[in-house]
Amino acid sequence: MIFNASQDSKTEIEYQTISSTQTYLAEEQSERLHNLISKEQLEKLNQAFNERPDSQVGFDDLRGLLLEQDITFNDAVYNRLFLKINQNRDFMVDWNEFVSYLIFGFQEEDPSSQKESLILPISVAPSVRKTEHRSTVCCVALLKAKSDQVPIEEVTETVNFSFGGEDSPEASGMWVTASHEGMLRFWTSHMEPIRTATSESSKPHAVYCMSYAFYNNGKVHSKLVLGDYAGNVRILSYSPNLRGPFQAKPGAALIEVVWADVLKGKIPQMIPKEYINLHNEMISCVHYSLHMNALFATAEYRNTKKYRGRCPGMIMVTYDERSNFRVPLGVSTFFVAESHNIVVTGGPDTFVRIWDVYIPTEPSAILTGHNGGIVMVFVQPEENKVYSVDYQKIIKVWDLQEHTLLQTYGELVRLIHPSETDMTYFYHSHLRELIVAGRKLISIKCCPRVRVDLTDGNTHAAPVSVVLYNRLFRNIVTCGLDSYIIVWDPWSGRRKIIMKNCHTKMIYGEIIDIEITAATFDPLEQFLLTGARDGTLKIWNYNNAVVVRNMSIMPDQEVTSVIWVVDRILAMGWDRQVTEFNDVEGREYGDPKKWSKFHTDDITCADVKLGEGVVTATYSGEVIFWKLETGQPYRRYSVMDPTRFIELKLTPEEEKLMRRSKRLMSRLGSSRMSRATAITMPKADDGRDYGQNVPISVQAVLFLQTRPQTIQHGSVFISLDTGYIQVYSHHSRGGYMSQFLSVHKTGDCVLTMCTDRKNRYIYTGTAFGYIKVWHIVNYCVPEAEKVHVCMPRLRLEFIFMRKEFWVTRAKRVVRHQREPLLVSSYKAHLKAINSIAFINLPKIVFSGSHDYSCRLWTQGGRYLGTLGTVLPWSKLSPFERAGSENQVYRLPPDIKKVASSTTLKVISGVQMDRPAKRAEVKAPEDRDEETAQTDDGYDLKKIFDKPLKEPILGKHFTLPGKSVMDQRIDVDTTQSYIAVYTHLKVHHTEMLERLPTPAVISRVAGENYMDHYVPVEGKVDLSGSALNIKQPPRRNVRPNDPRNMRMAKTRGDMGPGPSPSQQSE
């Protein structure tokens, strides 16, 4: 394909220059002009552009201008450079296009673009549990195992991943909660209770807040800072060596220290220091920075008439110098970020202020947006985020550098009762968790680290729907159901551009993101076309995230496939027809052309053979071949009966069905029920029965571009949801040729397919996350074109083909299948693979899955990495083949836990198992000679003096023998399904005979406990039996005493005989 480059010259640009058909370049030449042009050269180029007519230059003219500035390129590199600069696709470059390309080059190298998060800082549901306190929790503390403050010489580069050991008690510490009744409870880092204690104390000026600063190395004295209700601040300094003053003493379970004794020096291990009346009000928060050797103390000044806004909300004491940070109404809470030398404060005035610790006169930034007083602030310096919580339990997340609002989190309002206002907050910097305590304990993860022992990270915040490789810019473009488009540099693993909210829709005043379901490039691969679930299409200049054009096929009809050929754009989906848009300058905004509507169900997939035809397939198994130039159909098939000839016209039943579907669509409108497409992952235990009346849907189609349009060549591969792949010839007199089973698990099917440039291999991605590579050189081709396949060469490249002692499941399925040849099979993702693509020169396969990740693999199956990972990236080159035999490859952490022996062998590249050597059977004479020469310890005759006799296993349970009657079940297989319950023998239940009730139970059931009740006045003798009752001693016996008369009357009623209790005893 050739395009005219300039109106003034006959120079031509070949499309071949951006494809991977170009040979290996001896030396990679940079196309980044911003690294080669200086300021003086740029001014000369500007002057040269202005001297040209219309300030535009052509293909040769631009190359001449660059040569004048001593900037040279070879032909292949310059062709690519010109296509990158020429964004208007008119093959004329103006000054604005030239400068825009330079600006985009600088933007790609901006490190801030790498730190933009795909998800919100607080995106995980909080964990809630009861506090087990009798009253509301008033204080939360952390028994730290590691200090938050690190000496400046020990500061290392912060990483955003962990290996899973930070949540252990040795690393994360224990939580301590306290309530007003004096109860203390200790919890693990996962909020599991450990033990309970009580505490009682009384002081004239109670301590309101405390802070503890220490280093892990123990070389610097630790500081315990106390702030009380009178505005005083006291510091206790002591050495942590050998537990300092907190050493255990024999016979003393509790160490009590009196402050007066500390001041008098009676405890030499403690060095006290007091700041009396540091504030005029109660101390609200204190902190001691060992790095700056400074004390920070804050207080609230709510009496505006008394202080008139000139109150020192926060005071920083360094040696004998004091710095006052004046804040109206004072400061309630603050956080010191020593790595950035900043202090973030919050108070009753609802403002969050960011201060430089060395400039106390005015804040460097003021963050507004809260509607209540600030009660908690903290900073994540490694993430450049500020978190603030107000009195109304609303959490806001801010960007520390841009001072912009990132997220507003209001889930606490739902979890906490409105009557609970005085909540307690504590931030665990090691686990990145915010603990909220009141009547409940709530744990909120704030931008948690990636557990590299569980996953390598995610590429998108939702399932990845489409992955593409751009041969012009040599980058990978991923589109997801989160409505994101991300451009990646696969050679360095960097994220170049991220475009959020690409397809949106406003519903009831709220902007909703629409999932991206299809995408492709233009023929020159300068622009990107995306299709969404609501039927909209957009053309993007994805280098600057600008929408060039908006289109739509039909409202609320999902776009399942898009095709971009020269001067035309084809889109198809749930509208059951092909929609053609013009891509010619001046006619791009006309009405689209609708092709004939022959499909009776939703179109699920489509593909194109350049210059020849288009194939479309539906959910009901219909396959139609179209002429690309005219848009007319010429063949129609059904995958359930592929050999049957189907005439290209609608039957009366189909016409009736079409009219009914039109009426139904007009009634339902936008409330159409969504149908599961190829993006949704089928369940493994799906009990779908592929009978005669159940349609078989088509999941993917693939055109082989190098195979000619003949009857003998199978050029179209069609994947079915039964797990089979059918092969067709797209010739007008061709048709169905063959099929093969492409999966080895029941219920699995191929969702996406791709091939290499020469159509030697086909790469398939399945619904269960498997990638399979098939060798198709000799498959469905004439006998004269079949070539010899060098099997040893394939075994060197694909370790899957090497022999094993046990035949694995993937090989057992295809052991009787000669063509196509399965050369590799491994599990690449835990969920369905929605899209797969191949890079020809470096031989890299990359797949996008429903598990939010896009992973890169070598052609042999070695794991290269996941786009968006936090781990170091192994450097790749677009001109060298990826992978080497000497390199050690690792497995994805999530695959490692579920991988089979085949997957472990393919991904790691190591075959551990070896066939066991069988012992040679020797003659009896040789055996006797060797027995005589062996040691006595290995002589079997000495170990066993006589043969074993039955029973060898001793007394053990033996299985019952088989029944004499052979019960054969004749299953009715004439129907499309087997009625199992009709073949089962069901026995009727019989009434069970009720056993007689024992006499003892009948007699006890008939007894009355009142017969054994004896009213007695006295005390029970606990030393003896429970029935040994002692009468109280009588002081004096009076004949007229009414109490004696009552006792005598009672004994008279009972009679002289023994009591019932005595009888029972």
UniProtKB/Swiss-Prot annotation:
Pfam families: WD40 (PF00400). The keyword Repeat applies. Keywords: Repeat, WD repeat. Residues 926-936 have a biased composition (Acidic residues). WD repeats lie at residues 153-197, 326-365, 369-408, 459-498, 511-550, 598-638, 745-784, 828-867. Residues 915-925 have a biased composition (Basic and acidic residues). Residues 915-936, 1024-1065 are annotated as: Disordered. It comes from the Eukaryota. The keyword Repeat applies. InterPro entries: EF-hand-dom_pair, Quinoprot_gluc/sorb_DH_b-prop, WD-EF-hand_domain, WD40/YVTN_repeat-like_dom_sf, WD40_repeat_dom_sf, WD40_rpt. This is WD repeat-containing protein on Y chromosome. It comes from Drosophila persimilis.
